[in-house]
């Protein structure tokens, strides 16, 4: 009798809303670290026993289980684990049951079915775990029920989790080390106050970059689990390589000592083909220019010249007091518009991929 396999998929939702729910940089730092932890160590250490990982980045988790009980355990327990670790984030899950032969010969079709099931689940509203009762004290920044008080500030559970992770410890700088390509960073290098990031200039930039034509390239690598896993890992490596190259090329122009300097960059998301960064406004355009160039070079190097990718970016220049979630929404919208313009036949012409491009906007209105 042929043994069955179980393809498990999870899509974590509300990531950006969770990260940018306040204008406190230390809370954004903690939020980004929490999301990074959920997608990597939290899942791997608790739910990957007996499973084989396929994709594990940027809020998407896919793996194959040999044992039904292990798969059922993940479906039952992982959402609760996520919601306890990061209150405010929701998760959609789906499972496709296949035979070993189907997994080998029709892997792409199996993954398409999994994506369809995940899409259905994402459209089902999730019950909020953070609404609370009337008459309870609430956080002044998020409006959610407070569970503790620090000095004169009431903190909800999500903010408390972010603070615990953002202040001290190796987790605070894990994403920064991955983004900068520097080892043994000190917490002193990471700004937890927006004023330390901007120095005397109150302008900051929120950058969001995303790869072009990923769906077309992905179809080439979806014929087997091994190929898709290898593609996912190499794409993630290329994105990190581009971010590191951009940081080192742009920031070497500024004098700093790793022991004491606060870097004018704060990575928020880095994985898959996505990159979100908060930085000093004067460095944003130079950083994005190098990042887009290096992303093209790195994907050609790792995926092959014929499979190289391009990317588009959006930059929102805002005052540090301007609501971060509006700034991120603007950066994401600008990135989307840059993609639309790049795909114009008059611009793309006969090129296989839309050219890399950037669109930016400076918000002049008061916060």
Located regions from the model:
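Regulatory and interdomain segments flanking nucleotide-handling catalytic cores
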Residues: 1-367
């Amino acid at each position: 009798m042929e043994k069955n396999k179980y393809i498990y998929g999870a899509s974590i939702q509300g990531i950006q809303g969770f990260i940018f729910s306040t204008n406190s940089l230390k809370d954004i730092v903690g939020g980004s670290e929490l999301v990074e932890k959920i997608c990597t160590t939290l899942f791997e250490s608790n739910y990957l026993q007996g499973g084989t990982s396929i994709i594990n980045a940027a809020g998407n988790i896919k793996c194959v289980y040999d044992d039904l009980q292990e798969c059922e355990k993940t479906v039952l327990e992982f959402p609760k684990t996520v919601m306890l670790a990061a209150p405010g984030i929701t998760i959609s899950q789906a499972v496709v049951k296949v035979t070993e032969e189907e997994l080998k010969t029709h892997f792409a079709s199996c993954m398409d079915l999994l994506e369809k099931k995940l899409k259905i689940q994402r459209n089902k509203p999730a019950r909020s775990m953070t609404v609370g009762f009337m008459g309870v004290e609430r956080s002044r920044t998020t409006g959610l029920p407070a569970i503790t008080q620090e000095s004169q500030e009431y903190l909800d559970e999500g903010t408390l989790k972010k603070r615990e992770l953002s202040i001290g410890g190796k987790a605070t700088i894990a994403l920064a080390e991955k983004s900068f390509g520097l080892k043994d960073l000190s917490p002193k290098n990471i700004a937890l106050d927006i004023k330390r990031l901007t120095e005397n200039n109150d302008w900051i930039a929120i950058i969001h970059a995303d790869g072009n034509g990923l769906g077309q390239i992905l179809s080439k690598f979806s014929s087997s689990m091994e190929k898709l896993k290898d593609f996912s890992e190499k794409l993630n490596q290329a994105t990190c390589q581009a971010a590191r190259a951009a940081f080192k090329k742009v920031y070497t122009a500024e004098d700093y000592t790793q022991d004491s300097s606060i870097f004018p960059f704060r990575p928020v998301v880095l994985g898959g083909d996505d990159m979100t960064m908060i930085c000093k406004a004067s460095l944003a355009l130079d950083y994005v220019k190098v990042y887009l160039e290096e992303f093209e070079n790195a994907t050609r190097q790792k995926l092959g010249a014929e499979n190289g990718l391009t990317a588009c970016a959006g930059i929102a220049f805002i005052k540090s007091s301007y609501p971060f979630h509006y700034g991120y929404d603007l950066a994401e919208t600008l990135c989307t518009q840059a993609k639309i313009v790049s795909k114009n036949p008059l611009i793309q012409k006969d090129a296989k991929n839309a050219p890399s491009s950037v669109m930016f906007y400076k918000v002049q209105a008061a916060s």
